[in-house]
Amino acid sequence: MKKVLLFLIFLVSANLSAQLPSPTNGKKWEKVEQLSDEFNGNSIDTNKWYDYHPFWEGRAPSNFKKGNAFVSDGFLNLRSTLRKEPSSVQDPFKDIWVDAAAAVSKTKAQPGYYYEARFKASSLSMTSSFWFRVGQFSEIDVIEHIGNPSKENRQDDLPYQYHVNTHYYGKHAGLQPLGTEYKMPGRGRDNFYTYGFWWKSPNELLFYFNGKQVMRIVPRVPLDEELRMIFDTEVFPFATAGVANIGLPKPENLRDNSKNTMKVDWVRVYKLVDGTAAEDSSDAPIGSYISLKKTQGDGKFVTGEKDGSQLVARGSTVQSWEKFKVEKHPKGGITLKANSNGKYVQVQGSDINKPVRAAGDFQGDWEQFEWKSKGNGLVALKNVLTGKWLQAPWTENNAIIRPKGPVDNGWETFAWKKETSPTASTALSAQLETKTVDGIRVYPSPASETLTIEGVEGENGLRVFDSTGNPVLKKEGILGRKERLNVSGLIKGNYLLRTGSGEQTWFQKN
């Protein structure tokens, strides 16, 4: 998980990932971990990816260079670089002078899966692509995007174009490609957008933009073979393979790391399995604050520790820390937001022995629960990721809550009831108090809508992005002991603040 840097003035967690398509009856979406990656480490996960294309050298005048695909600052970076000056080769349209980038999955993609990736294109006259190939007869291009064509007459269309395509080879050689396109609201080089692809069947391909279906292709032949998932960059010296005549990349742009890099925030892949995704949660009190209490033993109320360390049944009465807000999870089921610190209740990955804690900054897989009403004011809560029920042992006083329950009986049941919402004055007071997180001290000035940040000395700048990935604020240079950020110009909505080293947090302005 990306490290949380600080709490901001308008502290509300937000989920910015795209909504999954509605599953077919009797099915639910399950994440395919081997094909999914948040790119949060310090290096590319070699269990999942090749950092080059082992099955193809690339498209002349570019070749893929091992290592030009790398992970840093929370992104998979695909950087295209200058191997030699184009003037030094005999034919700049055919001779190799550009080092391109590719990341190829080691696990094969399959029909039936849903694939989505959030990325920003490079500002080059090259493709920034998300596609599938390395089979016997087929290719599926989810997007081949031209961020900054050298042909000036294409600047008004190609940077806004979401182009999909299918190609046919081998036993189907001779069939013409079949594609379509969608005009995006902004340029791919300026914005992080989420591009989705549901390989619904061999005969139906659905394409999504920021969670909304925008295109559909019925391929010329059934596309039923497993393929590799690929992110890459390529030079297209001529109009070919469904890509327009865009012009060669400019050497000065290939030297500029602010322009030569396609940045992938994450890729997430899901498959349909039998079952329903927390659909029993339809009777959950969405939007209400509730308390949870052990049904036997010491009968204590569940408390969300403010430091986010754990949930523990230790409250004798319902106070601020014993209240949780029930919210709808975007993938089904619910989330619980702790009133103690504004964080989402989460498990710690698949480790069922670790405490449940109020530490989630967004509504992800760790924060997804099923609400199962047991009647008579009782409820059982199942974490969807682990498949286990939250448990408070009756035999322990001040019991720590863990996702260990194999069934929804006894220790796994809680008495619940609706509680009064925190008053506006209480909520305002909580927003305005001074925050100290990991040595970083943050305090707002509501009258002037500025935020003072201490403890970021030495960081190389910071930036604020809106929910579509557009940069809306920035502070450049090496940060000092005390920095101020004016947020008065921001409209209502969700935002991401990220420092130069990649530390970040989500916030919302109301």
From Swiss-Prot:
Chief location:
periplasm
InterPro entries registered for this protein in UniProt: Actin-crosslinking (IPR008999), ConA-like_dom_sf (IPR013320), GH16 (IPR000757), Secre_tail (IPR026444)
Q: Where is the GH16 domain?
A: 18-275
Q: Signal peptide span per the entry?
A: 1-17
Q: Which GO terms describe its biological process?
A: carbohydrate metabolic process
Which residues take part in binding substrate? 56, 59, 134, 139, 144, 234
Q: So what EC number does this one have?
A: 3.2.1.178
Arranged from A to Z, the UniProt key words for this protein are: Glycosidase, Hydrolase, Periplasm, Signal
Q: What is the effect of changing residue 148 to D?
A: Abolishes beta-porphyranase activity
Q: GO cellular-component terms in the record?
A: periplasmic space
Reactions performed catalytically: Hydrolysis of beta-D-galactopyranose-(1->4)-alpha-L-galactopyranose-6-sulfate linkages in porphyran
Tell me the enzyme class: hydrolase
The record's listing under PROSITE patterns reads: GH16_1, GH16_2
**Record-annotated active site:** 139, 144
Top-level taxon of the source organism: Bacteria
For this protein, the record's CDD domains field holds:
beta-trefoil_FSCN_ZgPorA-like
The keyword Signal is annotated on this UniProt entry = yes
Q: Which GO terms describe its molecular function?
A: hydrolase activity, hydrolyzing O-glycosyl compounds
Where found, per UniProt? Periplasm
User: What function does this protein fulfil?
Assistant: Cleaves the sulfated polysaccharide porphyran at the (1->4) linkages between beta-D-galactopyranose and alpha-L-galactopyranose-6-sulfate, forming mostly the disaccharide alpha-L-galactopyranose-6-sulfate-(1->3)-beta-D-galactose. Some longer oligosaccharides of even number of residues are also observed. Inactive on the non-sulfated agarose portion of the porphyran backbone. Displays a strict requirement for C6-sulfate in the -2 and +1-binding subsites.
Q: Which family does it belong to?
A: Belongs to the glycosyl hydrolase 16 family.
| Name by which UniProt lists this protein | Beta-porphyranase A
Q: Which gene encodes it?
A: porA
